């Protein structure tokens, strides 16, 4: 069986059914045609991200995506600064 890939937006919207709209995990999983353990993982990830915890998996919320991009950019700039300091 081929593994299905879901977009971050789909994961977020699916998890929001449970977190924001008070669906049960089982009902949301059935409505979105995903496994119960998959839905449980997405709900946990969304709740963690909303509490400000750094996700171990791919980020769900747009804010977490932006934070990840900014952290990478900051790391690159800091590395460039270190290289320039050594040259001077």
Curated annotation (Swiss-Prot):
Function: Involved in the transposition of the insertion sequence IS911.
GO molecular function: DNA binding; transposase activity
Listed name of the protein: Putative transposase InsN for insertion sequence element IS911B
Domain of life: Bacteria
Protein family according to the UniProt entry: Belongs to the transposase 8 family.
Keyword terms: DNA recombination, DNA-binding, Transposable element, Transposition
Source organism (scientific name): Escherichia coli (strain K12)
PANTHER family, sorted: PROTEIN DISTAL ANTENNA, TRANSPOSASE INSN FOR INSERTION SEQUENCE ELEMENT IS911A-RELATED
Pfam families: HTH_Tnp_1 (PF01527)
Entry-linked InterPro entries: Homeodomain-like_sf, RD_transcriptional_regulator, Transposase_8
A single GO BP: DNA transposition
